[in-house]
Amino acid sequence: MIIPVRCFTCGKVIGNKWDAYLSLLQIDYTEGDALDALCLKRYCCRRMLLTHVDLIEKLLNYTPLATKSS
């Protein structure tokens, strides 16, 4: 859904790096090079960005169930 603010393992702040990571991927960086450019050296922090699935845009397409009027 939304990228976590901190790494689950070490507690480093990573929430502010998501947009920069996506922009680096847009300009043809590889995943590893983009993470290196963001100074994410620990594998626990790297996995937080690599394994994140951004579902918020897909979920916004659904509306809550409307109540039926009699």
UniProtKB/Swiss-Prot annotation:
It is found in: Nucleus. DNA-dependent RNA polymerase catalyzes the transcription of DNA into RNA using the four ribonucleoside triphosphates as substrates. Common component of RNA polymerases I, II and III which synthesize ribosomal RNA precursors, mRNA precursors and many functional non-coding RNAs, and a small RNAs, such as 5S rRNA and tRNAs, respectively. Pol II is the central component of the basal RNA polymerase II transcription machinery. Pols are composed of mobile elements that move relative to each other. In Pol II, RBP10 is part of the core element with the central large cleft. Its main location: nucleus. This is DNA-directed RNA polymerases I, II, and III subunit rpabc5. Pfam families: RNA_pol_N. PANTHER family: DNA-DIRECTED RNA POLYMERASES I, II, AND III SUBUNIT RPABC5, DNA-DIRECTED RNA POLYMERASES I, II, AND III SUBUNIT RPABC5 FAMILY MEMBER. Transmembrane segments: none annotated. One of its GO terms (cellular component) is RNA polymerase I complex. Belongs to the archaeal Rpo10/eukaryotic RPB10 RNA polymerase subunit family. The keyword Nucleus applies. It comes from Dictyostelium discoideum. Keywords: DNA-directed RNA polymerase, Metal-binding, Nucleus, Transcription, Zinc. Component of the RNA polymerase I (Pol I), RNA polymerase II (Pol II) and RNA polymerase III (Pol III) complexes. It comes from the Eukaryota. GO terms for molecular function: DNA binding; DNA-directed RNA polymerase activity; zinc ion binding. GO terms for biological process: transcription by RNA polymerase I; transcription by RNA polymerase II; transcription by RNA polymerase III; tRNA transcription by RNA polymerase III. PROSITE patterns: RNA_POL_N_8KD (PS01112). Zn(2+) binds at C7, C10, C44, C45.
